[in-house]
Each structure stands twice: as structure tokens, then as C-alpha cells.
């Protein structure tokens, strides 16, 4: 949006530019999400699979929330991972690689409360945003009993978060 090394970035930070960026991001997330869930990607981008394609079936994903540049999904872990990789790739094409993309992905049992999933994955997203260069995804698995009982640990830290750049 504004080059980091610009000597006068305030000159470009106008209300109309922010409105255009906001509108473009809302359009992207409103229109593109459904297609990625169905594995319908722009020309030249093939869907990412951790395992082989399940006979062209749509991904087993439910959109709980999508607004602005935020998104909260639940579903099969391998489909969510494929979705995250595809969303990052399509987002990079859409923004010509000019914007970073941070995400948090958690693994939960089917009985885990969705409100708690949202809270912890939000913390994971913050870990990804706070990593050097931002352009990262925070993943996690079961934490140790020690970390779960530690009073000063965030929920994401208690669950043993691992942060990776999208290039790793």
C-alpha cells in the first residue's frame, strides 16, 4: 500500500486510499473464500493438498465468520491446511505480493467449544503477526502438562505454538 522506505508516507495515507484498500480487501474475502473452499482457484494456481485429492470433492470446511480481513473457519484439519496455503497463494497474486498474510491454525476435538477455538486461534494469529516479517502461519499441537498449568502463559503458548513463514 505504502512502500516502507518512502520518505513521506503521510502524503499517500488519504481517506480515499484507505477506503479503496478496505473495499478491495472486503471484495477479495467476500468473493474468493467460497471458490477456495470448492477448490476453484484463479487460472494457473492448482489447489494444494497434504494428501491426494478426494475425487474433486469440496473441502470439508465451514465458514463461521468472514468480515473485512478476518476469517474464522472450522473443518477437517487437512482441508483447512490446504485452504490456508491456497488462500495465501491467491492473496499474493491479488495483492501482487505487496501485503503480508498472517494466520493461526489450531487443531481441536469436535467437542471443544468454538468460542474457545476462536480465542486461541486469534492468539496464534497474533504470534504469526508478531514474528519477524509477519508473513507467517502459527500452527500448534498438544502442549505439555507443564505449559498448560503455567499461569503466565497465553493459551497459544500453552498449546506449544510453532510459527513458520509461508516460504518454509
Q: Model-derived features: where do they sit?
A:
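Charged, helix-rich terminal subdomains or tails
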Residues: 1-168
